[in-house]
């Protein structure tokens, strides 16, 4: 979860420090004592690792390249890379395949880094998550759900693509499309709000992405400006699928209380069963924020904000079109059974008069010119990333997998929790 600081004009900004405790917890260094120290020395000794009895103790395969082992800081492959990861396993992938260049984001369980693959020189965004932090919060199901959703998203123009995933003894790695046009939140911070044509373009691309997820029976559940990126041309890219709920049929519901406070729908706050229309409420909240600069029911006092969401009538200032007003009233309908999209889902959204200037076929083919061009000069252009991230040094542990915890119960538990995580595309996908 991205943590941002407030801008200089408090009247037009709001605090987004949610998840701070989780962020701090996720990055606390783990203490390593006793047997772990011995295991670390044993596992990093190339000669000892060749001995059959040592291999049996550590559950290691013999080193494939002793010269590489001695010259590279990455230790031998960890057991979590040797366990059965299913038919999509990519056990050969490892952190040392990448040159990690910059920190470009943070979340509750880890960091996102700009990385260049050492073989093909391609740039990727690599999301690195700490297994212990995930298990401590009992979030392993959400992580596996994110991985599953990413596998389904790879062909959609407005959803971030997963190239492959792999794991080490203590970390999970998502190798994703590198998007460097900046978060929508970053641009809203700078510009306060957007003109209606720009807000329409972004909300149309967002709606297309949500409609595609719904067609796969996936509810997104966490739409907010921090999870919406702009690519180098200015198109929307939706990212962070950790709160997605799979297998929700058109008339199906779920009941987990999750999301981000400013964008929670009334039925979620009521802890009632909710359906895919929760995403259309969030779209309304984001569109409102793009037009007015704040979420629709915002208050610095969370309890007051929740009360506003549940009970306060929607207030719309007169500086927007009647079409925009009508769309916001439909999306931000407190009764989900009357909300726009409750019957025909995305079809109702795209047929709304507000989107009449949009040619949806051209939009999905990226033939429509974005209203804003980030003007990035190349992969190393980081101007649209918060210096809070890019000024942070890249942790040395990111590029290697310390085997000091190989014999601990917690690592064995972590390996079992993430069986099937690793993924590599088939060769057919490259043809």
From Swiss-Prot:
Residues 356-431 form the AGC-kinase C-terminal domain. One of its GO terms (cellular component) is endoplasmic reticulum. It catalyses: L-seryl-[protein] + ATP = O-phospho-L-seryl-[protein] + ADP + H(+); L-threonyl-[protein] + ATP = O-phospho-L-threonyl-[protein] + ADP + H(+). The keyword ATP-binding applies. Its EC number is 2.7.11.1. Protein kinase that may play an important role in cellular stress response. May be involved in the regulation of processes such as cell survival, neuronal excitability and renal sodium excretion. It comes from the Eukaryota. The active site is at 222 (proton acceptor). Gene3D superfamilies: Phosphorylase Kinase, domain 1, Transferase(Phosphotransferase) domain 1. Belongs to the protein kinase superfamily. AGC Ser/Thr protein kinase family. This is Serine/threonine-protein kinase Sgk1. Residues 98-355 form the Protein kinase domain. One of its GO terms (molecular function) is protein serine kinase activity. Pfam families: Pkinase, Pkinase_C. Keywords: Apoptosis, ATP-binding, Cytoplasm, Endoplasmic reticulum, Kinase, Nucleotide-binding, Nucleus, Phosphoprotein, Serine/threonine-protein kinase, Stress response, Transferase. It is an enzyme of class 2 (transferase). Residues 58-93 are annotated as: Disordered. The keyword Aminoacyl-tRNA synthetase does not apply. InterPro entries: AGC-kinase_C (IPR000961), Kinase-like_dom_sf (IPR011009), Pkinase_C (IPR017892), Prot_kinase_dom (IPR000719), Protein_kinase_ATP_BS (IPR017441), Ser/Thr_kinase_AS (IPR008271). The lineage of its organism: Eukaryota, Metazoa, Chordata, Craniata, Vertebrata. It is found in: Cytoplasm; Nucleus; Endoplasmic reticulum. Residues 81-93 have a biased composition (Polar residues). ATP binds at residues 104-112, 127. SMART domains: S_TK_X, S_TKc.
